[in-house]
Design a protein with these regions (language model features):
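N-terminal pre-domain/capping segments
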Residues: 1-97, 249, 256-266
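Hydrophobic faces of well-ordered beta-strands that scaffold small-molecule active sites
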Residues: 3-10, 43-45, 71-77, 100-102, ...
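Conserved, mostly hydrophobic/aromatic
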Residues: 5, 35, 66, 92, ...
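Active-site-proximal loop/turn and secondary-structure-junction residues that shape catalytic pockets
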Residues: 9-11, 47-49, 79-81, 104-108, ...
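Charged helix-capping and loop-helix junction motifs
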Residues: 24-26, 56-61, 86, 90, ...
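Active-site acidic/histidine proton-transfer and metal-coordination neighborhood
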Residues: 58-59, 65-161, 170
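Acidic/histidine-rich catalytic cores of soluble enzymes
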Residues: 122-216
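A short, acidic, amphipathic alpha-helical segment used as a generic capping/interface helix at domain edges
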Residues: 213-227
C-alpha cells in the first residue's frame, strides 16, 4: 500500500465553511509541499479544495512539481452526473492522475441507487478512454450492501469503492461490517481513526477523530480485507479547538503523527 495525504487531512488548514478561517489557508501547492515534507507517496486533492477552480497554469505547475517529487496525484470531487464528471476527468488527466474519487451525492442532492447506476454506466467509456479508475466513496446515505450491489452490477474494473471505515456509522454499520461488505471491491482506502466515548450525562455517545494509530481503528486488521495495490490516504476528524489557527496547528500535528504511525505498519 502507498501512504497518502489528502485535502481532508488538512480540512481546518484549508478552511471549513461556517467556521472562522485560518490566517494562511493552505493552497493545493502548499498541500503538495506538505506531502513531500512528510514523505507521502500519494496526495488526494478532493472537493474541499476544488481542482476545477484552478487555472490551467496552476494545474500544470502542480502536475510538474508532483512529478519532480515522485508524488502521485489523486483527484477528488462529488457527484456522478456525466455532464459534470466528464470535464472533471479531463482535469484529472491534466494532473497526471490515474485515480478519481467521488461521492454519489453533491450539492444538487442525492440520486437513487438506480439513478447512480445509470450515471456510472454512462461514465465507463469516458473512464476507459482516459485510463482512469473511479472510486465511489461509501457515505451516510447508503448502506454498504447497496453500494456493494451497485458496484458489482456495473461489471467493470474501472469503477470500485473508495472505502471509508467510519462514514457508515450513520447507517448503524460498524467498521467491520463496512470492511466485510466492501473490502474486496475497494480500490482506495481512507484511513480515518476515531474514538467513541460516552457523554458526560451518560445519555449517548460522541464520535471524534484521533491521529491514525491512536484510536479504535485497527489498521493492520483493515489491511487483511484490502488488496495491496492501492493508496492508504489519511483523513482526520480533528475537533474544533475554539480558534482557527489553534485547530489548524493541532491538525498539522495529528497529520505528522499519523504519517509516522502508518510508516510502521504499511
Amino acid at each position: 500500500m502507498k501512504l497518502g495525504l489528502s485535502s481532508w487531512t488538512y480540512s481546518w488548514n484549508i478552511g471549513v465553511p461556517g467556521y472562522p478561517q485560518p490566517t494562511c489557508p493552505m493552497t493545493a501547492m502548499d498541500l503538495l509541499k506538505k506531502a513531500h515534507e512528510l514523505g507521502a507517496q500519494v496526495l488526494q486533492i478532493a472537493d474541499n479544495l476544488p481542482l476545477e477552480a484552478l487555472s490551467l497554469e496552476e494545474l500544470d505547475a502542480l502536475a510538474a512539481q508532483a512529478k519532480a517529487w515522485n508524488i502521485s496525484i489523486e483527484a477528488g470531487t462529488r457527484g456522478v452526473q456525466p455532464h459534470k464528471m466528464t470535464p472533471f476527468l479531463d482535469v484529472a488527466v491534466r494532473l497526471g492522475a490515474t485515480f478519481v474519487r467521488t461521492l454519489l451525492h453533491d450539492a444538487d442532492g442525492c440520486p437513487t441507487v438506480e439513478e447512480a447506476r445509470q450515471n456510472l454506466l454512462a461514465l465507463i467509456p469516458e473512464l476507459e478512454k482516459r485510463g482512469l479508475t473511479l472510486g465511489v466513496e461509501n457515505h451516510d446515505f447508503f448502506h454498504t450492501l447497496q453500494i456493494k450491489e451497485l458496484i458489482e452490477s456495473l461489471n467493470t474494473d474501472c469503477i470500485g469503492v473508495c472505502l471509508d471505515p467510519v462514514n457508515n456509522f450513520a447507517q448503524g454499520e460498524s467498521t467491520l461490517e463496512v470492511l466485510t461488505n466492501l473490502g474486496a471491491l475497494t480500490v482506495n482506502f481512507h484511513c480515518k481513526d476515531y474514538t467513541i466515548h460516552r457523554k458526560s450525562s451518560n445519555l449517548g455517545f460522541d464520535v471524534e477523530g484521533t491521529p491514525t494509530g491512536e484510536g479504535m481503528l485497527d489498521v493492520p486488521r483493515c489491511r487483511k480485507f484490502l488488496h495491496e495495490d492501492m493508496s492508504c490516504v489519511i483523513e482526520l476528524w480533528t475537533p474544533w479547538q475554539g480558534d482557527a489557527d489553534a485547530t489548524a496547528q493541532v491538525e498539522a500535528d495529528w497529520a505528522q503523527r499519523s504519517v509516522q504511525y502508518l510508516k510502521t505498519v504499511l
